Design a protein with these regions (language model features):
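The feature captures the beta-strand-to-loop junction immediately N-terminal to the Walker
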Residues: 43-45
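Conserved catalytic motifs of ABC-family nucleotide-binding domains
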Residues: 162
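Catalytic Walker B motif of ABC-type/P-loop ATPase nucleotide-binding domains
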Residues: 166-170
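ABC ATPase nucleotide-binding domains
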Residues: 229-256
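Conserved ABC ATPase "signature" region
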Residues: 104, 119-137
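Conserved ABC ATPase signature
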Residues: 141-145, 149
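Conserved ABC transporter NBD signature motif
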Residues: 63-78
């Protein structure tokens, strides 16, 4: 995947993006852009609208206000260019497929669901597995892998798709230290190749490691900007609804 040439449209553009269910806003007024090679952390408490916003970017839920554009188009028109990595524990671990077969699923948005994967597709899938350190587990049944390994397989599936935009939902939840390091390295490679990354996460330390911008949400946008100037105790307090302080290791603690 070649890097995006300078001067093009942002990979992701949100303009007052709003989603409501039964007239009740779930997330509203989100503004921001994500450029090629950039990574943005979505941070907020449970129920803040992070997953809903990701679903809206995927074109799975309609906006009730504002706009979302992916590569200058509506999300539905750009689906082949967008990959999504859910939490590993949202998938059925008993589904009888191998790690390689899961990764091959990432090729279907490019080749279509009717065509069978060819040699080039299998090579892309094998390369993606190698990038997350699981080349030797290609034939292992997905359900026999550890939680961290399953999360790496799901990222490999996204890598095989060669996306321009990668969306992740809590990718580091419950993963071991090795998997965490391999996930961070793989995300860095994707960004270097020109992909934009948006991830929902509760881990502020990992947000600092993986992202250069942050979007703070609690049903509406609290802040959007460089992580060093936006992830402040004041804005975090506004996001989480209580007095907080940020320790040097990126951990939020309540003020006495």
């Amino acid at each position: 995947m070649a890097p995006e040439p300078p001067g093009g449209p942002p990979v992701l553009a949100l303009r007052q993006a709003t989603v409501a269910y039964e007239r009740e806003p779930v997330v509203e007024g989100v503004d921001g852009e994500v450029a090629a090679g950039q990574s943005v952390a979505l941070i907020g408490p449970n129920g803040a609208g992070k997953s809903t916003l990701i679903r809206a970017v995927l074109g799975l839920v309609p906006l009730t206000g504002g706009t979302i554009q992916v590569l200058g188009r509506a999300p539905q028109a750009a689906r082949r260019q967008v990959a999504y990595v859910p939490q590993a524990d949202t998938l059925d671990a008993e589904f009888p497929v191998s790690a390689l077969q899961v990764v091959l699923m990432g090729r279907y948005p490019r080749i279509g669901w009717v065509r069978r994967p060819g040699t080039a597709d299998r090579q892309a899938a094998a390369s993606a597995l190698a990038q997350v350190g699981l080349a030797e587990r290609a034939s292992a049944r997905f359900g026999t892998l550890s939680g961290g390994q399953r999360q790496r397989v799901l990222l490999a599936r996204a890598i095989a798709q060669e996306p321009r935009l990668l969306l992740l939902d809590e990718p580091f939840n419950g993963v071991d230290a090795l998997s965490q390091d391999l996930l961070l390295t793989a995300l860095g490679r994707l960004r270097a190749a020109g992909a934009a990354v948006v991830m929902a996460t509760h881990d502020l330390g990992l947000a600092h490691l993986a992202c250069d911008e942050v979007c703070l949400l609690n049903r509406h946008q609290i802040g959007f900007g460089p992580i060093g100037t936006t992830l402040t105790p004041e804005l975090l307090g506004a996001t989480y609804g209580q007095a907080l302080q940020l320790r040097g290791d990126g951990v939020i603690v309540a003020r006495p």
